[in-house]
Amino acid sequence: HSFPTRRSSDLDVVLMDRRQEDLLRDAAPQVLTVLVRRYGHFDACEDAVQEALLAATAQWGRDGEPESPRSWLLTVASRRLIDQLRRESARRRREDGVAALEPDERHVAPPADEAVAVHDDTLTLLFLCCHPALTPGSQLALTLRAVGGLTTAEIAAALLVPEATLAQRISRAKQRIRDAGARFVAPAARERDDRLTVVLQVLYLIFNEGYTARSGERLHRPELTAEASRITRLVHDLVPDDGEVAGLLALMLLTDARSDARVDANGLLVPIPEQDRTRWDAAAIAAGVELVSRALAT
């Protein structure tokens, strides 16, 4: 890949190394959840993570990746965020004429070895991105960006909108979450149920982007299909009696079970009748069939 010319507002990740791309795409949502849980300020946290990803792109490509990539990202993103929060605090003090405040523990960077995934806050982040203050289109775009780790270009292609329009939509969505005073807490059962339809749509789009990638050299991006399946399983654990959730998880498992056999050595699609069925994932198929059977029995 080559590096395109970048606008200052375009903070998506462009990487030369495919393995590093997969690593950063997997780590970014985890780092974001840590920052939002610790500091709040979802919009500022998301910007800080994107800046850390750009820093990783430049530094890792030159010097190689650090021993603990997630801790590196967390440290860099935390420092960027803290700098921004301090600047905002200083600006408010100047405007209000208030005496300088003592820094509190929230404005101190966490240690580099702080666990990124002590708690799996993915679902909390997912439902936050589907906040009712946002339009359905904004909910989809923001979740694909923050939780799915897709770039602006990939999301724009998935939603069939111009990239510039999509970037503005994401920016407005983050501002609306801030204006609504949304907190990084799990929604109550009724709120959760109201947002579930959008959540499932988002998870399906993430899976679909991974199963038939719209960009890059690979037809299949297993890190995206695996992440979509993982999060959908978390949602299923949360609402095990919901037939739509079970059906979506079954669809993902049964579809992705054939991934190793659907492309030949030349990268061309292999029709199902010609696929080597010994390469299908029998465990995933069994799990998918069991989900369907349980859903039909209820």
Regions found by a protein language model. Give the residues of each.
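Short, small-residue-biased leader/transition segments that mark boundaries at the very start
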Residues: 1-8
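A short, charge-rich alpha-helical start-of-domain segment used by transcription regulators
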Residues: 12-33, 37, 43, 193-201, ...
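Amphipathic, Lys/Arg- and hydrophobic-enriched alpha-helical face
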Residues: 23-43, 55-59, 85, 127, ...
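The N-cap/first-turn positions of alpha helices
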Residues: 28, 137-138
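Structural recognition of an alpha-helix C-terminal capping motif at a helix-to-coil junction
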Residues: 47-54, 67-79
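Amphipathic helix-loop-helix modules that constitute alpha-helical solenoid scaffolds
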Residues: 88, 95-137, 143-154, 161-298
